[in-house]
Amino acid sequence: SYPQALKEQVADALAGVEAIMDLKFGEAGNALLLSVRSGARASMPGMMDTVLNLGLNDETVEGLAAASGDERFAFDSYRRFLQMYGDVVLGVEHHMFEDMLEDHKDRRGVHLDTELGAEDWRQLVDDYKAMIEKELGQPFPQDPYEQLWGAIDAVFGSWMNRRAKTYRSLHNIPEEWGTAVNVQAMVFGNMGTDCATGVAFTRDPANGENAYYGEYLINAQG
């Protein structure tokens, strides 16, 4: 359980982000979207859970499409959110989303995600939501605040998942350190070839060399 004051503290901090970004969490036409990530004191790349594009729902996705002028981007972001949240928070197996995506590409006669258009992503959003409801017996949560607290719970919980525990054991990271949860305004890496996602270090994490080190993927999220 969380400290009694935490919900109010999160709400106050979220209001501060809204003011900086001039966006409103959950507002259909001007929605603030969030990323929810771990913030452990030692880097554990890929070990902890992450949820991106949080705040998207059937209304805010239309607002994102209008604001960006790119319907394909908006619905691609929504299907990514459904897949990530469905897996990390709701416990729907990751491969079920991937299998559905591959089946859709086969029917369309394409091989790459980039060959799918806005209508394809719209259809996959509907398919993902239907699959989640079938698996869980309840619909995907449309309330952004319910989404947020589900993601916060999941990221805190991921400190104790199997891969994180194994990584800590291999790298002598104490379990009692725990993790923070970072809730940030969403920055999109999937808006085109001039966008990317990646990680950067001021020292090489493998050997401590005083040199910049990093990796990135173009037109992707992570």
Residue ranges of model-derived segments:
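Nucleotide/phosphate-binding sheet-loop regions of phosphoryl- and nucleotidyl-transfer enzymes
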Residues: 1-222
